[in-house]
């Protein structure tokens, strides 16, 4: 019997030809006419909570498995939302307000990745596990938020996604449907499929360089991206505060604060272009 990961990879590979044609419309996959642009590597970057920690974004989960003194099951699962939507909305309202405080700003690591995108243009793609918007605020534009976005909400009936910067209450409804439905945070909860997976696996199959930054290596499917990239011949790099659970999979490794190791590595990479 296939595992969930096995089913996902099987489905991806069956649709590979169709996906390749569709994904060429994304800037990461589009071939350029200018010869020198073709010589630049395709770089896929994965970021996790470690890149935003120095900006003041807390990583939520503590050593005891609690998120801000709440059980994960209560605030980060569909079942928890069904049981107590008011508690779940209050939890994410607090996170949303924190993200918009003036002291929360992109740090040197975010800015370095924006600089890397500027240099690589169409051949750069950023996949983040983070639900904040610090990459966009730093200047990155080609970003896949595989775990959703804190400053958006989703209609629980139609799935339509809406920009939302204020608090959400149980009384707030989506009016995109024939019958107004409750709004929920546009966040991937435990037990739900991450977003953009077909695009991500396609990008992994085409990347020349795969870089993981600030990730723990605990959470799948993201923890398996390095293995997938290696299967397709990508050079793999880990930039982290300490070795991740899958650190031995990487060909190149640098450890230290993200605001230090990421800019240093980006400069090294740019020198080689």
UniProtKB/Swiss-Prot annotation:
Record keywords, A-Z: Cytoplasm, Metal-binding, NAD, Transferase, Zinc
GO cellular component entries: cytoplasm
UniProt xrefs under Pfam families: SIR2
Record localization: Cytoplasm
Residues engaged in binding NAD(+): 48-67, 129-132, 214-216, 240-242, 258
Record has tRNA processing as a keyword: no
EC nos: 2.3.1.286
Domain Deacetylase sirtuin-type: 20-272
Residues annotated as catalytic: 147 (proton acceptor)
Signal sequence interval, chain numbering: none
Cofactor note: Binds 1 zinc ion per subunit.
Residues binding substrate, per UniProt: 92, 95
Free-text note on domains in this protein's UniProt record: 2 residues (Tyr-92 and Arg-95) present in a large hydrophobic pocket are probably involved in substrate specificity. They are important for desuccinylation activity, but dispensable for deacetylation activity.
Entry similarity comment: Belongs to the sirtuin family. Class III subfamily.
Record-given protein name: NAD-dependent protein deacylase
Protein species of origin: Shigella flexneri
Gene encoding the protein: cobB
């Amino acid at each position: 019997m296939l595992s969930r990961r096995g089913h996902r990879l099987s489905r991806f590979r069956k649709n590979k030809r169709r996906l390749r044609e569709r994904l060429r419309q994304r800037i990461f996959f589009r071939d350029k006419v200018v010869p020198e642009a073709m010589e630049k590597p395709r770089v896929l970057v994965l970021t996790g909570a470690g890149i935003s920690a120095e900006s003041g974004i807390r990583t939520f989960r503590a050593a005891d498995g609690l998120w801000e003194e709440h059980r994960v099951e209560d605030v980060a699962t569909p079942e928890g939302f069904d049981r107590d939507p008011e508690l779940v909305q209050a939890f994410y309202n607090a996170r949303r307000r924190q993200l918009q405080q003036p002291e929360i700003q992109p740090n040197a690591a975010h800015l370095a990745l924006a600089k890397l995108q500027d240099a690589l243009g169409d051949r750069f793609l950023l996949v983040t596990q983070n639900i904040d918007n610090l990459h966009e605020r730093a200047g990155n534009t080609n970003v896949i938020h595989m775990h959703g976005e804190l400053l958006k909400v989703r209609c629980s009936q139609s799935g339509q996604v809406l920009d939302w910067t204020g608090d959400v209450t149980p009384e707030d409804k989506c009016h995109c449907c024939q019958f107004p439905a409750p709004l929920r945070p546009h966040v991937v909860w435990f037990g739900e499929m991450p977003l953009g997976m077909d695009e991500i696996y396609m990008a992994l199959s085409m990347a020349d360089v795969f870089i993981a930054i600030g990730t723990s290596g605990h959470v799948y499917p993201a923890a398996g991206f390095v293995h997938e990239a290696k299967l397709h011949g990508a050079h793999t790099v880990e930039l982290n505060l300490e070795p991740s659970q899958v650190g031995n999979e990487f060909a190149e490794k640098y450890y230290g604060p993200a605001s230090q190791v990421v800019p240093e590595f980006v400069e090294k990479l740019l020198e080689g272009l």
